[in-house]
């Protein structure tokens, strides 16, 4: 599993909330979320739309990217959705301290 390629994804709920997650299989994970078997934060939120996904490398890098994206403001996340960058590695280069 450590050799697997991980992906970062954003889902939008019917209320407009953006959910960020990581997985090795975006289609499988979306199906799990839609069946109510994914994150508790999405249960009962209605239809989910996959609005962004990109390759994130190995699990360690994916976890770091997920953390960075979750720290972004809603406006910054909306920019990601609008611009659809193929990579988010540049987020790892930004220092917050």
Curated annotation (Swiss-Prot):
A Pfam family this chain is assigned to: GIY-YIG
InterPro entries according to UniProt: GIY-YIG_endonuc, GIY-YIG_endonuc_sf, UPF0213_domain, UPF0213_GIY-YIG_endonuc
Domain of life the protein comes from: Bacteria
Segments forming domain GIY-YIG: 4-79
Family: Belongs to the UPF0213 family.
Protein name: UPF0213 protein YE0453
Originating organism: Yersinia enterocolitica serotype O:8 / biotype 1B (strain NCTC 13174 / 8081)
Lineage start: Bacteria, Pseudomonadati, Pseudomonadota, Gammaproteobacteria, Enterobacterales
């Amino acid at each position: 599993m450590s050799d697997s390629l991980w992906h970062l994804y954003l889902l939008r709920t019917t209320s407009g909330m953006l959910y960020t997650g990581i997985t090795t299989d975006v289609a499988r994970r979306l199906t799990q979320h839609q069946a109510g078997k994914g994150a508790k934060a999405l249960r009962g939120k209605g239809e989910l739309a996959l609005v962004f996904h990109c390759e994130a490398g190995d699990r360690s890098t994916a976890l770091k990217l997920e953390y960075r994206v979750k720290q972004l403001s809603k406006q910054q996340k909306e920019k990601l959705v609008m611009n659809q960058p193929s990579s988010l590695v540049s987020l790892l280069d930004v220092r917050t301290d």
